[in-house]
Amino acid sequence: MAAGPMITRPIPSSGEAMPVIGLGTSQVFDVGADDGARAPLKAVLRQLVEAGGRMVDTSPMYGRAEAVTGDLVAELGLRPRVFLATKVWTSGKERGIAQMRRSAELLRSPVIDLIQIYNLSDWRTQLATLRQMKERGQVRYIGITHYTTASLPELARILESEPGIDFVQCAYSLGTRAAETALLPIAAERKVAVIVNRPFEDGDMFRRVRGKPVPEWAAEFDCTTWAQLFLKYIIAEPAVTCAIPATANPEHMADDLKAGFGRLPDPQQRQRIRQLWDSL
């Protein structure tokens, strides 16, 4: 891994430093209580923190992922070093409050770092609740999320019209670049942090480059693997705060984390990456 600390970006609403590579838990943390299933997840969490990463993003919609995240973070004594993000996905004020209270219990964290409104579900109701929770100190940051490109204009409209949103989470990758024009400029203008999900498009991008060598010129920005290239492309976008690849594989986590170190591609190199991808 390159010398020096992981690259960080400031959360615009506070200035708090956020390392650019985090961890998603969708599917991969939905496991049982047996040690065999949890051991690699423990290793992944250790690697994240030892490399300087902080963000762990989960959700009530990810099956047992919230509970597993809470268990493992507690067992490893990592709570002071991780930034726990979860979501609310329900309609109605009382159901929203109950779901968020349950998330705090499962995550073993009376104060959650970030709660996001998942897929904009009943977002006006949940946003009002989240604002109250933030005022009471039950959550440090609040946000909105979606995973489809079709939702980007609505995410942008909400950022433009609703004050006090700290984070927006969206799908963005070298293969799906709509956010570059539809959302990221608005997020930057409104000073909203951006979390990127699905940076590898659920693994589809690796199938496209299977058997193909990483270009030699990728060494110009300290990149040796396709995973690093995909992630460095994303985090080189100034509006992006953090990317959250999901993995239960310690080797993959180690590779992903390396993207957060060393040089990042400049605008000309990013254009070259786009041209390469579009030619495949």
Functional labels for PLM-detected ranges:
Residues 1-82:
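N-terminal binding-site loop/beta-alpha segment at the start of enzyme catalytic domains
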Residues 12-18, 69-81, 100-110, 130-135, ...:
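Acidic (Asp/Glu)-rich catalytic clusters
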Residues 16-21, 52-55, 78-82, 109-113, ...:
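Short, well-ordered coil/turn segments that N-cap beta-strands
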Residues 31-33, 59-67, 89-96, 118-125, ...:
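Acidic-and-aromatic substrate-binding clefts and catalytic sites of carbohydrate-active enzymes
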Residues 104-125:
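Active-site groove signature of glycoside hydrolases
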Residues 119-280:
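Beta/alpha (TIM)-barrel catalytic core signal, keyed to glycine-rich beta->alpha loops juxtaposed to Asp/Glu
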